[in-house]
């Protein structure tokens, strides 16, 4: 049994990042809504509790509080932003609206040499005060500390930016240590989890394989599973894990919807049917998908159509397999490679408190009438954990560390209406971009630019531009190249690729892909932009 950290979610969009940071310290944690019962908290038996931020206001939303058991367990508690405010109020302090709201970068002064912050700083002032570079996002302020608490941190506009009652192990900070913009955030959270809560760092993926296999066997029993195999990292790792657990009772359905990357179908079949000896059924549904997507330009509508068609294809394929009598009794589970970031962006976290940004293919495309139970063995894992799990399962490094690919495929990388001709052009342009990234080494790091970017792809723009090739005028389509660097896919910076790489890629695309005469590069970060264009 692993030591556990309980994260109570009050509705912050970045609550999952807290979990990621705790997992990076190799400590198991779970996120649950702030209004879970006292009994649940006692049975969970956490080594420590973290209270998340929220978009709500403490003094206006009187129902958004931590359960009383949080304060009765006798374990360390860390409040973050709103979590600090509710700790203040519930422990007898006071909070009010601030005339000086703080959103963004701030420099926090540490006070009192508490266990949480001692020795953790970014720089010192001439007076010798330890300073932290942090990320703030709050409109309230603490005006009175609760009994037993002392000041731990401050800024000029926020006199109480951190507090501590070390006798009870209660700590709270106004800033967000979970985001990468807080430079020492990881060190702070590790200090709380490992040294203050004293949780054992025994959460590692190579050991998780046996636990995940046991969990799948317990959930599935002697029933059968059908899985949509896309060739992406998530579905591939999910397939390998489930196959390890139940063998031939897993049937992978590889749906070629005409929106895959170049030669992807053949590569998927070679790996899973050829090398892993898994049962894989390849379904050519390109014409069906293209017909249904004709005339549809809205991104959400496209996602819903693709999700619905996947369901229809799965149901039809399951019926065919059952009728064939080929040792298949009929699947009762549908497996998916859903991971934490998928759940976050579709507003489908366990807490149901986050705001929907876009529907996710895995989540939004499954209507209740599917008739299959859902198996999501990766749902609580972050991308880096999924990759580590894939390596532990013996999947090839190149497959496991391949860049993410969206469930709807090129359907959300073709802006507006999806057409076969557009997909053919985009496939070839994208393949050239990826090839150049793989072949270009950064001298400083010794790594390829494919390794240095977290996700890279081409986007098809349904507009034409004038060009000149030879002595003739061209009027052809435009593609945009997108490459980002991120540690968590919650936020991302555009990758500053070498000009020579971009020049070479642009030249190859324009010369080798007839129908494209202009290439642009996307220099938008997330936020405000999302990583995918649709």
Curated annotation (Swiss-Prot):
Catalytic activity as recorded in UniProt: XMP + L-glutamine + ATP + H2O = GMP + L-glutamate + AMP + diphosphate + 2 H(+)
Pathway membership, UniProt: Purine metabolism; GMP biosynthesis; GMP from XMP (L-Gln route): step 1/1
Record flagged with keyword ATP-binding: yes
Glutamine amidotransferase type-1 domain span: 4-202
Residues engaged in binding ATP: 230-236
Name of the top EC class for this enzyme: ligase
Positions of the catalytic residues: 81, 176, 178
Source organism superkingdom: Bacteria
Ligase keyword on record: yes
Annotated EC: 6.3.5.2
Protein purpose: Catalyzes the synthesis of GMP from XMP.
Name the UniProt record assigns to this protein: GMP synthase [glutamine-hydrolyzing]
Gene that specifies this protein: guaA
